[in-house]
Amino acid sequence: MFAPVYFDHNATTPLDPRVLEGMLPYLSVQYGNASSRHEYGRAARRAIDEARQRVAFAVGAHPTEVVFTSGGSEANNLFIKGAAACLAPGTVAISAIEHPCVREPAKALQRAGWRLREIAVDENCRVVGADFKSAIDEKPALVSVMLANNETGAVQDVVALADHAKPLRAWFHTDAVQAFGKRRLDFRALNVAGVHAMTLSAHKLGGPKGAGALVVDKRVELQPLIAGGGHERGLRSGTENVAAIVGFGLAAELATEQLDARARQLEALRAELETGLVAQGARIFGGAAERLPNTSCFAFADIDGETLVGKLDRAGFAVAAGAACSSANQEPSHVLLAMGVEARFARGAVRVSLGNDNTAAQVRDFLGALNTTISQLKGLAALTS
């Protein structure tokens, strides 16, 4: 069977074979419930404890700060809704480029009587310092600014932002789902600066889908979204998905190995990609910002992104139009619109997100296929205009 070249690693990553191998016993012979008080249960509990230690070590946190969830979306909801439930309604401040699993719970708070304050970003997808300071002057009780954007790859200076917000004593959260595995994370340093919670997900770094974590300062009071047996420090009830959690721990450990060298390789591949894109007339979004090393978001004027992605798929290349989590939405990306990108470009946005197994030859082949496809689409447009 023909396998397209996979250039969509910000959507999900292939399961690392070493991770799968570590998970298999917990999908077969080690089937105990971690709450059971016999050896099967104790074995499951030991596996979860070891995975928790691995995740904590990978991000510079204490194991007791790691709360396992079903993924990044649940972890983001747990922080925003869970923290808000323990506070009187006030202001929640989020950046204008947050993932929907931050934006939507924030909007839910707005419907429940909270004030929602969106913080502006500039043309390179970076939080505007003056508007952030203005938002902080409004004394929000909750603040959430993502560490790295899933569409453009733009990285925020979360340490500086949290440090500025620190005197306010608001709970500060960062969604690090895209950053984890692509750059080094140090929750202890973030916490000292004023970050109280950080979201992670396993499937973005060679782990399984269905496992994530909220790394959270124990001073933060949260009301659980799921009530029940009091698992995960009472913050996330439900029988643990032992196999997925084990896989998460292994993926987290593996992601930190040779991270800097892998990042340099990905940056070099992206540089070759973007040189070719610019030569073909593409506009790169967020190119002047510090970005994740693997991510490039671009568009051609008046070329529909969904159409381009479909043709590239048929040519053997798997890329994304905007973000995979909202691909059913045909509206222009809220991220690009927040950056001030005109609709004629925003509707054409395509994201290439490279992975460790991608090669320079694949990038060159992609550029060739893209050039052919763009020529065809422009020719068709000329005939129908």
Residue ranges and their predicted role:
Residues 1-385:
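Pyridoxal 5′-phosphate
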